[in-house]
Amino acid sequence: MPDSNFAERSEEQVSGAKVIAQALKTQDVEYIFGIVGIPVTEIAIAAQQLGIKYIGMRNEQAACYAASAIGYLTSRPGVCLVVSGPGLIHALGGMANANMNCWPLLVIGGSSERNQETMGAFQEFPQVEACRLYTKFSARPSSIEAIPFVIEKAVRSSIYGRPGACYVDIPADFVNLQVNVNSIKYMERCMSPPISMAETSAVCTAASVIRNAKQPLLIIGKGAAYAHAEESIKKLVEQYKLPFLPTPMGKGVVPDNHPYCVGAARSRALQFADVIVLFGARLNWILHFGLPPRYQPDVKFIQVDICAEELGNNVKPAVTLLGNIHAVTKQLLEELDKTPWQYPPESKWWKTLREKMKSNEAASKELASKKSLPMNYYTVFYHVQEQLPRDCFVVSEGANTMDIGRTVLQNYLPRHRLDAGTFGTMGVGLGFAIAAAVVAKDRSPGQWIICVEGDSAFGFSGMEVETICRYNLPIILLVVNNNGIYQGFDTDTWKEMLKFQDATAVVPPMCLLPNSHYEQVMTAFGGKGYFVQTPEELQKSLRQSLADTTKPSLINIMIEPQATRKAQDFHWLTRSNM
């Protein structure tokens, strides 16, 4: 009898699709986002049969953005499943975005059959080669038996070192090809990345530099959020009374309403700090490269980062601390604890920062309190902030919508803000919101995702509203509508303009159709839609949306087409003639 059972087992067959699904399951993949078709449909079905959640999107780009956000939120890669050729090409933007943001992502793409290569096969394209520019690892398994090995390596590569995107190419003939089940050897779940620590001597030097600082500043980046360093960084801030500034996605590592947060005096803090400690924040365009006039010429930078190649970029640091940000921060705490010390909370530096914060907050409050209609950005965000649940996710994209919203909308929890990020990518918002929503439903039921979109940004992925309604996700979309990119025109000006020439000759490139009813996209799919023009309408619609947990909502918020942000001490990027 045992011999008979063995013979029976050895003849059992398994398809390539099921091998792929089981390999993903073994690596703790929880979510797949994608658009099915030839040749990947069977992979999605096999994954669902194993308990992996599949979220069907309306565009591969949005699917890839969503999968990458899963990597940031869970520290294990989300999977983006795409068809061959154009489907894979549509996902390249999401792969590049994940790499730029240092988020783990695994893209699985179908490809043409091996025996048709170079013959002009259906959607034939050099996919492995194309993806190498946008990934840490790009490969095609040599056989079905090699699939578990390649998938494990891709998952491991995506989370080890600096996280990033990886690609696995699956030939169409692999998907339904049957092999002996005993020929498949599944790899064990790859371990979480090893925790590395900084050199002891460098930690001692860093502690000394911090103690001797006259005007210190901590900058908390999204790398600190990804490293789950909130506990150690908050302790460092509170124990030593140090002012801190979060980068956009570093918001919430220490709550924005913390008394030592100097976000409202950002420019002043950067310009006059003499010692700056960077926790997972890169000296790229977001932090103005660390160069004058945004910084003092002799400012001392202490860089804390997981990636050695990042250390010393653009500016020579005083100290570099290479390692896991949470572990390195604990090392700093231990070293600082050896000699009792505290930065004086009544110092001249603290006084300067508090005065500037008070001045900037007053200017923003004055703009928010304006009663004139249409509303401006500050009025909108002031009323939104009043009702935001403290535990909600805030997803944001747009130009002024994102930049102004970042200064008004508060984050109190780490990894609860997602935006255009390092790559400044427009179109990420709805994909990110969908990813946050599926994670919230599984891990923190009852949490809302508030997705704040400029009207132009909404257009990139607006059809994902159907995805939101299909899965009935806890998302409230706020479309801040100024009829354009940066600025637009009102209806009367628009009509007057069209009297003279064809729209292609007279409509400015940044203008969109005025008073577009984006809320009707949501109602078309069964969600709730609101068109609001006054603070009272905004308050009421947001209150109703938050109270109704059975449906997603879209609130279309009309603002002054020429509205802009308050005057800045420095131009954000480059000067513009607009």
Swiss-Prot record:
Pfam families xrefs: TPP_enzyme_C (PF02775), TPP_enzyme_M (PF00205), TPP_enzyme_N (PF02776)
Modified residues (Phosphoserine): 4
GO CC, any one term: peroxisome
Tissues showing expression: Widely expressed.
Residues at which Mg(2+) binds: 455, 482
CC cofactor note: Binds 1 Mg(2+) ion per subunit.
Reaction catalysis annotation: a 2-hydroxy-3-methyl fatty acyl-CoA = a 2-methyl-branched fatty aldehyde + formyl-CoA; an (R)-2-hydroxy-long-chain-fatty acyl-CoA = a long-chain fatty aldehyde + formyl-CoA; 2-hydroxy-3-methylhexadecanoyl-CoA = 2-methylpentadecanal + formyl-CoA; 2-hydroxyoctadecanoyl-CoA = heptadecanal + formyl-CoA
InterPro entries for the chain: DHS-like_NAD/FAD-binding_dom (IPR029035), HACL1-like (IPR045025), THDP-binding (IPR029061), Thiamin_PyroP_enz_cen_dom (IPR012000), Thiamin_PyroP_enz_TPP-bd_dom (IPR012001), TPP_enzyme_TPP-bd (IPR011766)
An example Gene Ontology molecular-function term: magnesium ion binding
Enzyme Commission designation: 4.1.2.63
Result after altering residue 456 to R: Does not affect subcellular localization. Abolishes lyase activity. Does not affect subcellular localization, abolishes lyase activity, does not affect oligomerisation and does not bind TTP
Region (Thiamine pyrophosphate binding): 401-486
Cellular localisation: Peroxisome
Keyword Phosphoprotein: yes
Keywords: Fatty acid metabolism, Lipid metabolism, Lyase, Magnesium, Metal-binding, Peroxisome, Phosphoprotein, Thiamine pyrophosphate
Task of the protein: Peroxisomal 2-OH acyl-CoA lyase involved in the cleavage (C1 removal) reaction in the fatty acid alpha-oxydation in a thiamine pyrophosphate (TPP)-dependent manner. Involved in the degradation of 3-methyl-branched fatty acids like phytanic acid and the shortening of 2-hydroxy long-chain fatty acids. Plays a significant role in the biosynthesis of heptadecanal in the liver.
Name of the protein this chain belongs to: 2-hydroxyacyl-CoA lyase 1
Species whose genome carries this gene: Homo sapiens (Human)
Gene, per the UniProt record: HACL1
